[in-house]
Regions:
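Short, acidic Gly/Pro/Ser/Thr-rich loop/turn segments
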Residues: 70-74, 166-169, 190-192, 250-252, ...
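Acidic/polar, glycine-rich intrinsically disordered N-terminal extensions of enzymes
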Residues: 14-38
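Short, compositionally biased
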Residues: 195-206
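Glycine-/charge-enriched secondary-structure boundary and capping motifs
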Residues: 2-5, 10-18, 27, 121-139, ...
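A generic structural signal for residues located within well-ordered alpha-helices
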Residues: 19, 23, 86, 193, ...
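A short secondary-structure junction signal
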Residues: 170-173, 193-197
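A structural signal for small-residue-enriched, beta-sheet-centric alpha/beta enzyme cores
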Residues: 182-190, 244-251
Length: 338
């Protein structure tokens, strides 16, 4: 991708659309800094708050919790009056965070906050939640629905997922070393991040009925559900994996959550049509795109070179996109995108 020249459309950024990643990081850190209490005795916490999932020590096993939501993708579903796939997104955003640590999702609860209830909308959301649970082989054991008129406008869909794994099989990223390779896995599209910026561009410059070169409309493409990377756990059973990364909000900057090394992307995966359209129409800087969206890579392995053949043969579309370097940072073709 590249910066567009000569466009009459003002350059768009995620911050201008209302999401300041740097401010969000500072705000989250301010919250985490106050979470100092740790349980004593059995079932203590392993590691620190801030990884993709939180771990609880259960002897030879660990339990893990992840929480996430669909975000403003719900507003696109509202615009199209189609909520059938947002439940898949909700499940995916949670289970993919568990897969990063080689955890098996086993149970899920959803949380719906809304200003008004619609049985039709709830049925469609339930359809997607059930399909997501099927893909992840996971139980949905309950949930909470809150009607909060005056506090909520629209509907916010989120969930919490419980995972489990033998303690000695958990992957935290601590084994990552310079010289490891980064193997990218294709996304299904925009997934569930960067929608605030995407919606701003669509609503200012086009419509959800606008066709893309891939034969879909913008609305159809955006509502394509987040890919559930259930197959990644099979790979960890057969070869050495030092770390994994779910490319969500913040794009490539998610690699910084794994280790204090450099992550250099030299050969990115093919960029889907939706991202090319957003960049060209919104006149978005290339680095800004990779700081905001997954850009076609929704998940990645960090592994020694000897593991590449096993990964590529097991996961369709997986291939080497870069490597780990000594100097901390995240680079895209040599450009520091921090």
């Amino acid at each position: 991708m590249h910066e567009m020249e000569g466009s009459a459309v003002p350059e768009h950024t995620y911050r201008d659309a209302g999401v300041d990643i740097d401010l969000e990081a500072r705000a989250v850190r301010a919250l985490i800094d106050k979470l100092t209490y740790r349980r004593t005795g059995a079932f203590s916490m392993l590691g620190e708050v801030g990884h993709f999932a939180g771990l609880i020590d259960c002897g030879s096993y660990v339990l893990a919790l992840a929480v996430d939501g669909v975000g403003t993708k719900m507003l696109v579903a509202d615009a199209l009056q189609d909520w059938r796939t947002v439940g898949i997104d909700c499940v995916a955003m949670n289970v993919n965070d568990l897969y990063v640590m080689n955890l098996e999702p086993v149970a899920f609860v959803d949380y719906i906050a809304t200003d008004s209830l619609s049985p039709e909308k709830m049925a469609q959301i339930g359809e997607g939640l059930n399909e997501g649970a099927r893909q992840a082989n996971m139980n949905i054991v309950g949930g909470e629905t809150a009607t909060l008129r005056g506090l909520v406008k629209g509907l916010d869909l989120a969930g919490t997922c419980l995972g489990v794994q033998k303690k000695d099989l958990v992957i935290t990223g601590e084994a990552i070393v310079p010289g490891d390779v980064i193997v990218g896995l294709p996304s299904s599209g925009i997934h569930s991040n960067g929608l605030t910026l995407a919606r701003k561009i669509v609503e200012e410059c086009a419509s959800y009925d606008t066709p893309l070169p891939n034969g879909k409309t913008l609305g159809e493409d955006i509502l394509t559900p987040t890919r559930i990377y259930a197959g990644v756990l099979r790979v960890t059973e057969g070869c050495s994996i030092h770390g994994m990364c779910h490319i969500t909000g913040g794009g490539l900057l998610n690699f910084r959550r794994l280790a204090d090394y450099g992550f250099s992307i030299t050969a990115p995966l093919e960029v889907p049509a939706i991202f090319r359209w957003l960049q060209e129409t919104g006149d978005i800087d290339g680095a800004e795109m990779y700081r905001t969206f997954n850009m076609g890579m929704g998940y990645a392995y960090i592994a020694p070179p000897r593991s590449v053949a096993t990964i590529e043969s097991a996961i369709p579309g997986a291939r080497v996109v870069g490597e780990v370097a000594e100097e901390p940072g995240v680079w895209l073709r040599g450009i520091d995108i921090r």
